[in-house]
Amino acid sequence: MSTPDGHTTACHIEACLADLGTDRFAQTFVSFVETLGVDQIMVFAIEHAQARCLLSWHFSRSVMAGKLAETYLDGWFLKDPLLPDLVVSPPQSVTLSRLAEIEGRMSADYRKLFFENPGMLAKTTLLAVGERLRLFDSLYQSDPAAPLCDPDLARLAGRLALLHFEKASDTDLPPPLAALSERERSVCLGILSGRKAEAIAADLDVAPSTVITYRKRAYAKLGIASRAGLFAICGK
C-alpha cells in the first residue's frame, strides 16, 4: 500500500472529526486506518476487569485474526502486558507502544497464541484514556517487508477513537457492526438473534445463498471465523 499524501490524510481526518459520535464514524474511521498500512485494527474498552470490543476490522485478504478476539475477550486480556500501564494512565492521554517494547513482559503462552501462531509480526497499541473510557486501540501488521505504521498518525487514530466512543450514545447496535454495510449488518443481527439463514433471507427478501454470501463478507471484514466469534465481539 502506498503512503497517502498530506491532502488525502487531511481529508480522512476531517471526515472522521465530522462524524464523531455518529453511526457514520466507524466506516469513515476504518477508511482512514486503512491508509496506515495495517492488516487489522481492534479497539477494546477495559472496564472493571472486563473487556468489551468496540471495533474489529480486517483489511488483509490473509487469514490472520481467526479466534483471536474471541480468545482475548475470554480472559486473556487480563494477561495483556500493557494492562497495568492502561490502568494507571492519566485521563486525556494517548500513549503509543510497539511490540518490541513489551515482548519481554509477555508470557510464552501469550506470545505464541496472539503473535507466533497467527503470524503477527508487528503491533502498535495506543493506550487511550478519556473521562470514562480506557481503550486499547491495536494496529496489527503481518507483512515482514512493510514499515511500521506512522507513530503520529497512529496516535491520532487512537485519539479519534477515544473521542468518538466517549461521545457516542448507547444504541441497540453492537459497536463492532457499525462499519459493515446495511445488508451485512442485518445478517449479523439476524444471526445474533438466533435466526437461521432461511428466516433471515425471508426478512431481507433475498435467497438463503445471498445471506451466506453477506455472512462470509461480514466475518472477513470483522476478522472472525465463526458464529462464536461474532457473539464474542458483540458481547452476546
Regions found by a protein language model. Give the residues of each.
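Recognition helix of helix-turn-helix DNA-binding domains
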Residues: 194-229
